[in-house]
């Protein structure tokens, strides 16, 4: 387990030695003794947090709402900068699901989340308690990843797939790092614009235009954390100018690009998921 230290924050981070058997699944393990007011930065994935240790975390969400323990969040959670995480002695496996496979694994459409947070137990019932107990019963992080991956694979096999056209459109957005022209997507899949927008939104949880913005922002944010100048990041990632980048970063995080460049969430992110940006 790698240790990441910044100021008083100490994080233990573990990564799987093998990729998931399900394309679109990535995982990391975390051990955090003191989690204090961590700003949640939006990410283009559905996130599952499975806690198993003695401690627990809490998410402070919009309008004073809180969620404790193991949770599921839709793509873009944290937009606007209002979501914070707190906790003591937290141990968890965090799973990121491509929205393309999220519906099959969750048993519900990401559209039902719409950037919000729900308890994992609300979606998985007894299976949520079962995986939490299993993770707590083993001492090896690699065994925890294997247990989690086996469960995800089983659920994926029996869950409903998204339309191939929707999966293809998402893939185009991701591989282009948000530089795809959304008006071309419908033409390229041979659907009407209305049909693609409706299917994309209902199956992946966000409309194509928002997906493009989120993927582009995610790539730009990780480059800012890597120390690149905002003007260069804006030029390289498809923003009209530095002011455009500034507005987008503010909209997604409630903070300036300079502040985002120092965000603990993103710094740890680059250790847990190297190359994700």
Predicted regions and their residues:
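DNA major-groove recognition helix of helix-turn-helix
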Residues: 200, 212, 249, 261
């Amino acid at each position: 387990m790698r240790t990441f230290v910044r100021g008083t924050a100490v994080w233990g981070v573990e990564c799987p030695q093998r990729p998931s058997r399900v394309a679109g699944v990535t995982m990391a393990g975390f051990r955090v003794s003191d989690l204090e007011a961590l700003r949640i930065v939006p990410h283009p994935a559905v996130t599952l947090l499975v806690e198993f240790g003695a401690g627990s975390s809490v998410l402070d969400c919009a309008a004073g709402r809180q969620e404790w323990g193991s949770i599921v969040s839709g793509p873009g959670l944290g937009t606007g900068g209002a979501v914070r995480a707190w906790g003591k002695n937290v141990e968890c496996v965090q799973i990121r699901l491509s929205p393309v496979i999220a519906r099959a694994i969750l048993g519900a459409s990401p559209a039902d989340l719409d950037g919000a947070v729900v308890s994992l137990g609300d979606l998985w019932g007894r299976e949520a308690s079962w995986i939490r107990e299993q993770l707590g019963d083993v001492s090896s992080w690699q065994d925890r990843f294997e247990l989690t991956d086996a469960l995800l694979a089983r659920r994926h096999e029996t869950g409903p797939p998204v339309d191939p056209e929707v999966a293809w459109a998402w893939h185009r957005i991701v591989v282009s790092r948000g530089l795809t022209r959304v008006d071309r997507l419908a033409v390229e899949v041979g659907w009407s614009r209305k049909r693609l927008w409706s299917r994309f939104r209902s199956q992946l949880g966000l409309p194509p235009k928002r997906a493009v913005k989120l993927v582009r922002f995610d790539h730009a944010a990780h480059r800012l954390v890597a120390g690149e100048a905002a003007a260069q990041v804006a030029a390289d990632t498809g923003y009209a100018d530095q002011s455009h980048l500034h507005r987008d970063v503010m909209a997604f995080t409630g903070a300036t690009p300079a502040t985002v460049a120092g965000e603990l969430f993103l710094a740890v992110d680059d250790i847990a998921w190297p190359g994700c940006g």
